[in-house]
Amino acid sequence: MSLEETLRSLSLDYLNLLINGQAFSDVTFQVEGRLVHAHRCILAARSLFFRKFFCGPDPPSGLDPIGGGSSRQPTVRPGVIPVNSVGYEVFLLLLQFLYSGQVSIVPQKHEPRPNCGERGCWHTHCTSAVDLALDTLAAARYFGVEQLALLTQKQLVSMVEKASIDDVMKVLIASRKQEMPQLWTTCSHLVAKSGLPPEILAKHLSIDVVAKIEELRLKSSLARRSLMPLHHHHHHHHHHDFGDLEDQKIRRMRRALDSSDVELVKLMVMGEGLNLDEALALHYAVENCSREVVKALLELGAADVNYPAGPAGKTSLHVAAEMVSPEMVAVLLDHHADPTVRTVDGVTPLDILRTLTSDFLFKGAVPGLNHIEPNKLRLCLELVQSAALVLSREENNASNNNNNNNNASSSAAPVYPPMSEDHSSSSSGNNNNNNNSIGNLNLDSRLVYLNLGATQMGGDDDNRHNNSHREAMNRQGGHGCDPSMYHHSHDF
């Protein structure tokens, strides 16, 4: 037997002591109401924290050396030590490493996790995997297990390469707090490359961290320019000035949107050449402004309602779905937002709402979104589902029309004799009228489907559409919803 096999066998023997529970156990912890049996000698040998806790005159905080909690909470089982500093899952990972020297920080594949709504996720770099690694890192530092902290840091470095920018910023904050220079360097460069403006970064990071990110960007820009030929320096100097000017435009645009001054934004587009898509004007307005501002911005005709933003490639409809805002969802769909558009990870707005609904139904509340109103969530889901259904029907109709046209063009010579000029023109006029009426009917059906505040239209067909849609909304949401509700101003 080789040395490696001997060490592996020794590691498994110690791990079996932990797995077998009470076998030879001389200490019991209580974590989140669950008992964990362990062995003092192993814990004291592997962790300075437990050595001081079991043997030192002044035990560290985080565990109750008496057992059973405070005097106001009488001890039910003497000798049980409550753990109040970490969760059950993280505490088991910590003990697993102390016993065996090995641990897998990645959650089980396809296991339902609280912060991961994707079905069948492998949890390699999702938010749930990142959160578990961060909690393990904090526990390793707290209990003085430096080897586990280094192992977790290495795991996080590989995770953040594929993680979302939100999770990268989360790890960046933790790396600074835990004094992990390698992790800080990796995350800070990823955030600097993300292209997010300082105003957005300031919402997630402290001012001094944002300043360091901007310093990294400046150094990177200077380094790139130093590699350019000398005759290009003058050009890049103007390019840098142009970038500063664009940043100023974006700040002015956001101030104008905050004050509902869409006319100023229009002047900036026409007079200064402001690109609303690159400035993420629509995303900003959906997240921070009222429905009226978003509608006025869309009616300028200068913004692409399906423009993907950031590394994740989210459209404004993705943002509205995450906000669970029926008003924003409605006005975006009214201006032809695509309910089936996908992010880089393949997530559609419909997927977001279905995940939120599933979490709400099975867990009673959505983590981080406890303010969600069930009726708003149902209404958003109904709107996006209806829009996706209408879009699918329109695509099928268009496909059928193309097939019919191809079949007609490839057929033999006409069987019937040519009609007179008057009859032909009359028939042509009737066909045009029929086509127009069909187009209007499709448009009316779309408006009724999306419940976007269309005015009451004459005719029995339209009444039947409106009545059937209200009945569907009553069945789905439990309450009838007047389309006029979307014309109210809602500030965010």
Curated annotation (Swiss-Prot):
Quaternary structure (record): Homodimer.
Source organism of the structure: Medicago truncatula (Barrel medic)
GO biological process, one term: regulation of DNA-templated transcription
Transmembrane segments: none
Signals that turn on the gene: Induced in roots during early nodule formation.
SMART domains per UniProt: ANK, BTB
Protein name as it appears in the record: BTB/POZ domain and ankyrin repeat-containing protein NOOT2
Zinc finger (C2HC NPR-type): 113-127
